[in-house]
Amino acid sequence: MSKFFRRRKFCKFTAEGIKEIDYKDLNTLRQYLTENGRIVPSRVTGTKSKYQRQLTTAVKLARFLALIPYTDNHDI
């Protein structure tokens, strides 16, 4: 028997009934970014491939419009 209980992954967007991911919803987008600004893969988050593609497009659009930084804040 395993020592640790692994939580089952589920798609948050399917569970909440979200049809499309909006690039202006920054709080949702930030949940799927690492502290360095990289997009977290679906094998880690459990999102379905349909929503992972929408998420990627929304993050890239938000980055282009300067709503989200491309990387973390570097101290130079």
UniProtKB/Swiss-Prot annotation:
Keywords: Ribonucleoprotein, Ribosomal protein, RNA-binding, rRNA-binding. One of its GO terms (biological process) is translation. GO terms for molecular function: small ribosomal subunit rRNA binding; structural constituent of ribosome. PROSITE patterns: RIBOSOMAL_S18. One of its GO terms (cellular component) is cytosolic small ribosomal subunit. SUPFAM superfamilies: Ribosomal protein S18. PANTHER family: 30S RIBOSOMAL PROTEIN S18, SMALL RIBOSOMAL SUBUNIT PROTEIN BS18M. Belongs to the bacterial ribosomal protein bS18 family. Part of the 30S ribosomal subunit. Forms a tight heterodimer with protein bS6. HAMAP family: Ribosomal_bS18 (MF_00270). Binds as a heterodimer with protein bS6 to the central domain of the 16S rRNA, where it helps stabilize the platform of the 30S subunit. This is Small ribosomal subunit protein bS18. It comes from Xylella fastidiosa (strain Temecula1 / ATCC 700964). The gene is rpsR.
